[in-house]
Regions:
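Hydrophobic/basic alpha-helical segments
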Residues: 1-331
Length: 331
């Protein structure tokens, strides 16, 4: 371990790694990589993150036969996974296994209520936590935002109790550590969300800003945010999406993100060819399609000035982008 130039004593490890290490999840994924072969045999999608395994399968909710076949596929796949884990000294945690059926809120609710995992029946949930994000049955993220607001307000109340003993700078540090980080975590998923969802988070940020600035609850919030140089929640979401886009275009993001955006190359020699634009795919469903990264990222990227797009590094891009969004928010 190395901290500020100081190194700990070297110790040889004959097996395993310390809990919480960066290497731990990678080694676990290498060990369990055969699970991917099992899942692919059933034509299912999957995500592996350390010991968290997610299986995905789409089906027509209006077709009883298709739904029954999908249930059979999932149960057979999980049965094979359970068998492989038992043979390789691992255990499938049935108590933490969840079933989430995602569908449009404009369609009838699918009748799938449970699946069989070994001899344990897993009932359908109305929400599931996905690496810190609460997914609901319509991907509205309403439950996630409510959870974030509840946690952030809890910490804000605790900070408020000791505010009289803190300087503004110390208060700002605590707010960033316990509140802002929660508002910003995975906030790119909220792009295109209904106004009432964004306003829930904005009210939390407003409370945090007034606490840092020592302003009363009735104080107008725009001057406070401007003085603190804080981007409002909506602009913070746009900032995160554009940052991911910049990284994807400069080979600094995972391939699964880079593959979602395509540079715009006109067939004729047009002035737009020098503007570093991205192709915007056509979508059929506005409420869901426009929120997809493959659609939202090009739209916002095409709107920002060229000098921001041509930034030479991530730090320069972030600085220029924040200045641009700040002017838009408070002009």
């Amino acid at each position: 371990m190395s901290i500020r130039g100081a190194r700990s004593v070297t110790r040889s490890l004959s097996c395993g790694v310390p809990q919480g290490s960066v290497l731990g999840p990678i080694l676990y994924l290498l060990y369990t990589s055969p699970l991917g072969d099992i899942v692919r045999q059933y034509n299912m999608g999957y995500h592996f993150y350390a010991d968290d395994t997610q299986l995905y399968l789409s089906f027509n909710s209006l077709s009883g036969d298709d739904q029954a076949y999908s249930v059979s596929q999932v149960e057979s796949c999980v049965r094979d996974i359970d068998r492989w884990m038992s043979c390789n000294k691992l255990k499938l945690n049935r108590d933490k296994t969840e079933l989430l059926v995602i569908s449009s809120k404009y369609r009838p609710r699918p009748s799938l209520d449970s699946i069989l995992v070994g001899d344990h029946r897993v009932e359908r949930s109305d929400k599931a936590r996905n690496i810190g994000v609460v997914f609901d049955e319509t991907l509205s993220l309403d439950k996630h935002v409510s959870s974030v607001c509840k946690s952030a307000l809890f910490h804000l109340r605790n900070i408020a109790k000791i505010r009289m003993y803190l300087t503004s700078e110390s208060t700002k540090t605590l707010v960033h550590a316990y509140v802002t980080c929660r508002l910003d975590n995975c906030n790119s998923l909220l792009l295109g969300s209904p106004e009432y969802i964004i306003q829930k988070l904005q009210r939390v940020q407003n409370c945090a800003a007034r606490l840092v600035a020592g302003q009363p609850r009735a104080a107008h919030i725009r001057p406070v945010l401007k003085e603190l140089h804080w981007l409002p929640v909506e602009q913070r979401i746009t900032f995160k999406v554009l940052l991911l886009t910049f990284k994807a275009l400069n080979n600094l993001a995972p391939p699964y993100l880079s593959q979602l955006i395509v540079p715009y190359n006109p067939t004729r020699n047009l002035r737009s060819a020098s503007k570093h634009l991205l192709e915007v795919p056509n979508v059929r469903l506005k409420s869901y399609g426009d929120r997809a990264f493959s659609v939202a990222a090009p739209k916002h990227w095409n709107d920002i000035p060229l000098d921001i797009k041509l930034s030479g590094s991530v730090d320069v891009f972030k600085s220029r982008l924040k200045t641009y969004l700040f002017r838009l928010a408070f002009s």
